[in-house]
Amino acid sequence: MNIYAVRLITFSPTHTSKQVGEAIVRGTGISDVARTDLTFHPAGKLEIPESTLTVITVPVYGGKVAPLALERMKDVHASSAPAVLVAVYGNRAYEKALVELDAFASDRGFKVIAGATFVGEHSYSTQQNPIENIKDVVWLKRCLDLKKAV
């Protein structure tokens, strides 16, 4: 399988899932990058070819993938495109969110090749009262480590 492009699909109300996804995409070294941001709008009908690595990043709420993220991705399908799945969680556990995202992506034709979880900024965080408990430098290193594993 030859990979010629990367597509980042993200749902990121606090921008944290998007930041993690962007770091993973940069780590691939692939310059042909398409982005689908589901934060404000659904993806619509989208077919991902086998030659495109897809990075899907979503936040976790209450141990599950944010329901709105799944709703906005429902018309995204793949022809055995490889996928890296990322669940970003805040002050709680991610529980089975990655398993849930794996089932969702697999049902839509993705070939899941990797999954990761990252601790990120909690949705209750504010500039005056940040409750982010991981720094960008650590994220970037983990994103690059994920690239090596893939």
Question: Predicted regions span which residues?
Answer:
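FMN-binding flavodoxin-like domain, especially the glycine-rich phosphate-binding loop
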Residues: 1-7, 12-150
